[in-house]
């Protein structure tokens, strides 16, 4: 375990234990502690697992890696939902950047790279994805053969890459050193490069409702829990210029609510998810009216757009 004595965002030594939560979406029931910085309100896992030990929490049974197939006979419906999400993310890029054939989209923490495949199809540009392992694509290489997929960390990216758009769809909360990664990305960026970050929002109604069962903890994979205040501080310290901060994202906030309910229920996450599908759909219908309020008060997600210059 790695103990941290200074806030990773502001450097303060004034820390306090905030909450203890059990492992989520995993077969063990290990208890972990999250600290909170008294200066900038940043919440982070402390102590945290060593990187090599954390890898066991990203097995091939990890639900995001299993994707739509985890839902058995309902696979088609879930895959359509993923396609819809990917297209929302493609649109988010089109809204902030003009791209051509030689343009490069770099997705950090790409997991199963369906988003990059959608970018190829809709934007007709070059796509690069990087993750710390290849579990998200190793069994479907033919589906993603036109995408430049790499195993490694941000620090492993070449200095001459120069992406036009960098995306972090629920990656930054997993990063062991977010300031170092953001600074590294800034160094390889062009003046026109755009950065899109989507993360769970600590200052959200779902976190307040579910407390230790909030799926945003994603214990122990999520090392950082950001609020608008400290993620803006993080970006400024990394020399990125913040353009916009939204209290919502492309991901449906209902997913956080549903996963939180499943944590309360104590389901086995590596099982066939068929039996949960009907309840998932009914819950989504009941949740729909709350979405009208997410632009005023975060339900669980936030998005930050930043410029290199």
Predicted segments, located by residue:
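N-terminal juxtadomain amphipathic helix
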Residues: 1-72
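A C-terminal cap/extension of S-adenosyl-L-methionine-dependent methyltransferases
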Residues: 2-5, 20-26, 247-309
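Conserved SAM-binding loop
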Residues: 3-4, 85-212, 223-237, 302-308
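A SAM-dependent methyltransferase catalytic signature shared across enzymes that methylate proteins
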Residues: 8-16, 229-248
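Short aromatic-enriched loop/helix-cap "lid" or pocket-rim segments at secondary-structure transitions
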Residues: 20-21, 29-30, 141-142, 163, ...
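Short catalytic/ligand-binding loop motif for oxyanion handling, primarily in non-cytosolic enzymes
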Residues: 44-46, 114-116, 204-207, 251-257
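Short glycine/proline- and charge-enriched loop/turn segments
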Residues: 72-75, 210-219, 259-267
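Conserved SAM-binding loop and adjacent beta-strand
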Residues: 74-89
């Amino acid at each position: 375990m790695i103990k941290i004595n200074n806030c990773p965002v502001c450097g303060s030594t004034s820390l306090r234990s905030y909450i203890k939560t059990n492992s989520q979406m995993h077969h063990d029931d290990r208890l972990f502690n999250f600290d909170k910085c008294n200066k900038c309100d940043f919440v982070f896992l402390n102590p945290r697992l060593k990187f090599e030990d954390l890898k066991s929490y990203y097995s091939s049974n990890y639900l995001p890696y299993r994707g739509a197939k985890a839902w058995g006979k309902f696979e088609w419906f879930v895959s359509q939902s993923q396609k819809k999400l990917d297209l929302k993310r493609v649109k988010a890029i089109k809204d902030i950047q003009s791209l051509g054939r030689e343009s490069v989209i770099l997705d950090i923490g790409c997991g199963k790279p369906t988003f990059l495949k959608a970018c190829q199809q809709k934007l007709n540009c070059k796509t690069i994805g990087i993750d710390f392992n290849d579990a998200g694509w190793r069994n479907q290489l033919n589906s993603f053969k036109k995408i430049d997929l790499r195993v490694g960390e941000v620090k492993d990216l070449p200095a001459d890459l120069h992406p036009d758009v960098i995306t972090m769809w629920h990656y930054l909360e997993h990063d062991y050193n977010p300031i170092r990664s953001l600074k590294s990305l800034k160094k390889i960026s062009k003046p026109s490069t755009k950065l899109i970050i989507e993360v769970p929002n600590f200052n959200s109604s779902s976190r307040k409702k579910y407390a230790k069962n909030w799926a945003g903890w994603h214990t122990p994979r999520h090392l950082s829990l950001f609020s608008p205040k400290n993620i803006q501080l993080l970006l400024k310290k990394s020399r990125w210029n913040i353009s916009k901060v939204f209290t919502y994202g492309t991901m449906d906030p209902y997913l956080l609510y549903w996963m939180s309910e499943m944590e309360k229920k104590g389901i086995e996450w590596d099982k066939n998810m068929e039996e949960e599908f009907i309840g998932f759909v009914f819950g989504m219908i009941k949740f729909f009216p709350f979405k009208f309020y997410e632009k005023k008060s975060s339900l669980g997600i936030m998005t930050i757009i930043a410029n290199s210059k």
